[in-house]
């Protein structure tokens, strides 16, 4: 079960995303997971490097010599938000997307369409600081994911899912409403469907 401390930290990161402009719960979880993966990738690399050093055996790391700057422990301390953002957009994110470029592995298939959506350097650095403060050991990782999924479930119940505009437009075009139709949207949130219908009728 998730501890109160971890829950509070996750809630704070969620709020940072929300106030920073990412309000779709699915996108919050997606971007949260990408950054968490980047952090854990560096932690695994550090552990394997240490073990190889103790055992005196060679280790060919995940991060080549010319990609060391893509490690969480390196870029989180750059200090300049714009520099971190540029490195993430043009270096770190493309790097993790292409870790398995064969196109056959499950990783390649799931990461092939991954998009970095954090809109500003300020938001990215706040989220990095928040995630860096998460001390995830053992079962706490599973607890974290369960909690994120529970937030996704409650967001759906609270009507926090927004239907993308192009989907709304397609559905309205398929229905082909006429002025004499009576229209009801019982799951109305921001009234996207009704507004689109109004524009269509005009």
PLM segments and residue spans:
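Short glycine/serine/threonine-biased micro-segments
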Residues: 157, 187-190
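Conserved small/polar residues in nucleotide/adenosyl-binding loops
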Residues: 199-202
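Non-catalytic, mostly N-terminal accessory regions of nucleic-acid modification and defense proteins
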Residues: 1-179
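Glycine-rich SAM-binding Motif I of class I
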Residues: 191, 195
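Conserved class I S-adenosyl-L-methionine
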Residues: 180-187
């Amino acid at each position: 079960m998730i501890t109160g401390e971890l829950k509070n930290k996750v809630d704070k990161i969620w709020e940072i995303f929300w106030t920073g402009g990412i309000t779709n719960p699915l996108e919050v979880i997606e971007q949260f997971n990408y950054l968490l993966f980047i952090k854990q990738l560096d932690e695994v690399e550090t552990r394997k490097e240490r073990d190889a050093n103790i055992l005196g055996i060679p280790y060919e790391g995940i991060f080549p010599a010319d990609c060391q700057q893509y490690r969480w422990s390196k870029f989180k301390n750059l200090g300049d938000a714009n520099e971190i953002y540029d490195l993430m957009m043009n270096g770190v994110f493309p790097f993790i997307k292409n870790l398995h470029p064969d196109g056959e592995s499950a990783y390649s298939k799931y990461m092939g369409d991954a998009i970095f959506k954090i809109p500003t350097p300020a938001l990215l650095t706040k989220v990095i600081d928040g995630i860096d403060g998460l001390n995830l050991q053992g079962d706490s990782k599973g607890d974290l994911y369960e909690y994120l999924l529970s937030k996704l479930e409650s967001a759906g119940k609270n009507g926090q899912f927004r239907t993308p505009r192009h989907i709304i437009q397609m559905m309205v075009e398929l229905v082909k409403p006429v002025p004499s139709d009576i229209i009801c949207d019982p799951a109305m949130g921001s009234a996207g469907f009704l507004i689109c219908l109004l524009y269509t009728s005009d």
